[in-house]
Amino acid sequence: MKKWKKFLVLALSGVMIAMALTGCGSSSEKSDSDAKVEDVSTRTVYVSPQWVNAAQNGKVKGYKNVKVFEVTYTGKLKDSKSYKKGHVPGAMLIGDTDVEDAVGSQEEPYNLLKPEVIEANLLKHGITKDTKVVLYGEDPSGVARVAYGMIYDGVEDVKVLNGGLDAWKDAGYDTETDVNKAKAATDFGVAVPAHPEYWTSMTDAKAKLQSDSNFKLVSIRSKAEWLGKTSGYSYIDRAGEPEGAVWGKGADSAADVNGYMKDGKVVDLKTLQNGLWKDVDFTMDNHLAFYCGTGWRACVPFLICYQEGMDNISVYDGGWYEWQMYGDNPVQVGDPDSDNCQHTTVSQLPTDKAAKN
């Protein structure tokens, strides 16, 4: 009899614990589903973890089939330690090399791939122009690069989990280690690139600097890069900026966009206008062609402006890396507003300005 009573007590205890745990789970789910998330438009890029969670759970109208991707450089599992360690549930892998070349030659200076190649790569990931995409990753500029490439090619609704996986976990959401794979799509749904106006070539940049007073070539580089003290990169020997460029600030090195972020999250345009961009040599009425060294950092301010509905924006994709490959390209070294700025050509630059790793 005592054994039976002991068994009964243990059984009841187990039921109570299970109910308590179930109750906790229900409460969390209810709070997520009832919590108000931000309103978004198709062109909204940066979204909260709460919004992503709600979309994944079918709680956001129009986003029931959202696809989440973690961005790593190659998008291959063997190279993606962060993904293997733990990722947003349901997230698949995609790489920067799905949208840009990895060659680094004069013919392929880390620019976007040909639009047809981007299209083919996106289709392999099940992405068409109508796919609702959410991206995140460890490098905010690398994530922005993929988002920019998708928008350029024609994906109409691309979101970025602002703050990445850290923000996701800080919001109390779980991660998983399951490897999720996409089902390929066959029809992208639009001729590519859908938005060629968002991409500026070196030839176009040179021509517009000469002929279009409304065109501003905006450097998203560190102060040391802007002033020509360093190239910022171990594989670029020359330092300087294209003649006529203006400074958009925002980086402490070639590997960050710190000025465009606060508390690990990308800021909005109003914050930029009231802070970093309060005293710059361009306005929102100019055509703004952002550039950096090889294209990653420039994509962050592009997306910030894009989500505000601006269309007078682009990325000069080749950046300083491509510009300094051509000896006759005009260059400025130093602050162009000062008397100390040197105006020369690439061929006359010293070749000892590579960054020391």
Predicted feature locations:
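Bacterial N-terminal signal peptides that target proteins for export
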Residues: 1-11
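C-terminal motif of bacterial Sec signal peptides marking the signal peptidase cleavage site
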Residues: 19-23
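Bacterial signal peptide processing site
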Residues: 25-27
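N-terminal module-boundary/linker segments of secreted carbohydrate-active enzymes
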Residues: 31-74
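Thiolate-centered catalytic microenvironments shared by cysteine-dependent enzyme domains
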Residues: 35-39, 112-207, 293, 297-321
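Active-site neighborhoods of enzymes that stabilize oxyanions during catalysis
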Residues: 37-49, 102, 166-243, 328-357
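Helix-loop module immediately N-terminal to the HCX5R catalytic loop
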Residues: 102-129, 249-288
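Extracellular low-complexity, Gly/Ser/Thr-rich intrinsically disordered linkers
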Residues: 265-325, 329
